[in-house]
């Protein structure tokens, strides 16, 4: 079997909900990191790209009708380059990278752009059609996140808990205390603040320039979601999201955000032909399914399955990027895997609680950040894993070259 190499990875800053990137359409946002890859790799014959595989969780608004193809065209890729959009909700862009790697390892492709985009600020309200003339049963749904147009049969079978409710379920089932969740969130904020102060994320971010009606364009070059001023005392004052006495709060959960990320993946032949630098090898990936009501726990079985598949151990992982959808689910996973709550390998530069979680882009962000951390620390293996709504988990391992 052939190898699949990551040769470049870049992302936009992650914007706050209704923040600096809210003025940018999802398809335009998705084009930005692709265009950056084109600019950063001038030796590549871009007409020879075999595919663009982009993740996106919503696809109900400006990201409809194959946003991957739209972003590819807007980025300036030749029309001959095909593109597709995949949807595994939160795991979409990590799935896109895994799909690209499989195609290259199988010899079906040599050069693929994989990544994802999400504009949660611009997620539309939608309304279904009436089933009869002059119907009055239509309901307006907010597509920002979570369920819409719920199937009553699925509801009866598995329930349709909101994402915060699933985190509360995990906290209760696995005994994750509020204080531990807040400590985890605080650590995430502190690690991100330290990384930002050192300029750590600058090398993985392409600035977004937003024209204004009057005056100079606004340039967004820094993640907007982190709150360096977060304190444990402040977190303790927040009320539960699901219920007043609940443990899941806005402070120990990820954000609602906007962003995009793209990764250039190449075969041995493409690396040689275009004189590219192979930075990491994609070793293996996997997905699992669990009960939807505790979807946040899914990374634990996904990681166990993947390590067995790759014949590796958790001790061999130098970097572990575990998406922080909620502190409750992240802690349930790390504890099940036998990791300490403050393991320095887990999200060493903070995670989604601080950086934000634009659903379809987050997986590619994990890989981008993990790659840079491996190179900075001299580590060998990085593990990236995410929980996924409706009860799934995904995991992927890369090896620094």
UniProtKB/Swiss-Prot annotation:
Entry EC number(s): 2.3.1.174
GO MF entries: 3-oxoadipyl-CoA thiolase activity
Residues at the active site: 90 (acyl-thioester intermediate), 357 (proton acceptor), 387 (proton acceptor)
CDD domains in the record: thiolase (cd00751)
Catalytic activity: succinyl-CoA + acetyl-CoA = 3-oxoadipyl-CoA + CoA
Pathway: Aromatic compound metabolism; beta-ketoadipate pathway; acetyl-CoA and succinyl-CoA from 3-oxoadipate: step 2/2
Keyword Transferase among UniProt keywords: yes
Short name of any one Pfam family annotated for the protein: Thiolase_N
Biological process, per Gene Ontology: 3,4-dihydroxybenzoate catabolic process; beta-ketoadipate pathway
Keyword Acyltransferase: yes
Record key words, sorted: Acyltransferase, Aromatic hydrocarbons catabolism, Transferase
InterPro entries to which the protein is assigned, alphabetical: PcaF (IPR012793), Thiolase (IPR002155), Thiolase-like (IPR016039), Thiolase_acyl_enz_int_AS (IPR020615), Thiolase_AS (IPR020610), Thiolase_C (IPR020617), Thiolase_CS (IPR020613), Thiolase_N (IPR020616)
Similarity field: Belongs to the thiolase-like superfamily. Thiolase family.
Function: Catalyzes thiolytic cleavage of beta-ketoadipyl-CoA to succinyl-CoA and acetyl-CoA.
PANTHER family, sorted: ACETYL-COA ACETYLTRANSFERASE, CYTOSOLIC, ACETYL-COA C-ACYLTRANSFERASE
Record-given protein name: Beta-ketoadipyl-CoA thiolase
Species annotation: Acinetobacter baylyi (strain ATCC 33305 / BD413 / ADP1)
């Amino acid at each position: 079997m052939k190898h699949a190499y990551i040769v470049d990875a870049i992302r936009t800053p992650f914007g706050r909900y209704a923040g600096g990137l809210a003025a940018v359409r999802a398809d335009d946002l998705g084009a930005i990191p692709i265009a950056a890859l084109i600019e950063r790799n001038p030796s590549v014959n871009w007409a020879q790209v075999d595919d663009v595989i982009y993740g996106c969780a919503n696809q109900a608004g400006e990201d409809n009708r194959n946003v991957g193809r739209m972003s590819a065209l807007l980025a300036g890729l030749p029309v001959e380059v095909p593109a597709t959009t995949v949807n595994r909700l939160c795991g979409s862009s990590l799935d896109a990278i895994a799909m690209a790697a499989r195609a290259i390892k199988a010899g079906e492709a040599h050069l693929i752009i994989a990544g994802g985009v999400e504009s949660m600020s611009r997620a539309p309200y939608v309304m279904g059609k009436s089933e009869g003339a002059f119907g009055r049963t239509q309901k307006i749904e907010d597509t920002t996140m979570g369920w819409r147009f719920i199937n009553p049969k699925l509801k009866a079978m598995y329930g349709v808990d909101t994402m915060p409710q699933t985190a509360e379920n995990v906290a209760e089932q696995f005994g994750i205390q509020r204080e531990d969740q807040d400590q985890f969130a605080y650590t995430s904020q502190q690690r991100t603040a330290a990384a930002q102060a050192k300029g750590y994320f600058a090398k993985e971010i392409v600035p977004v320039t937003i024209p204004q009606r009057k005056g100079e364009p606004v340039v967004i070059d820094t993640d907007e979601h982190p709150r360096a001023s977060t304190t444990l005392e402040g977190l303790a004052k927040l009320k539960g999201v699901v219920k007043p006495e609940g443990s899941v709060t806005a402070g120990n959960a990820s954000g609602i955000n906007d962003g995009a990320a793209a990764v250039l993946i190449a075969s041995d032949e493409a690396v040689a032909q275009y004189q590219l630098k192979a930075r990491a090898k994609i070793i293996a990936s996997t997905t699992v399914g669990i009960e939807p009501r505790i979807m946040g726990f899914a990374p634990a079985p996904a990681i166990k399955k993947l390590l067995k598949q790759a014949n590796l151990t958790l001790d061999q992982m130098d970097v572990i990027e575990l998406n922080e959808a909620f502190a409750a689910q992240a802690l349930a996973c790390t504890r099940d895997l036998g990791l300490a709550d403050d393991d320095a390998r887990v999200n060493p530069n903070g995670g989604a609680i601080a950086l934000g979680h634009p659903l379809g882009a987050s997986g590619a962000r994990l890989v981008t950040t993990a790659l840079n951390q491996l190179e900075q620390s001299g580590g060998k293996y990085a593990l990236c894993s995410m929980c996924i709504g409706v009860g799934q988990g995904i995991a992927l391992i890369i090896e620094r070259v």
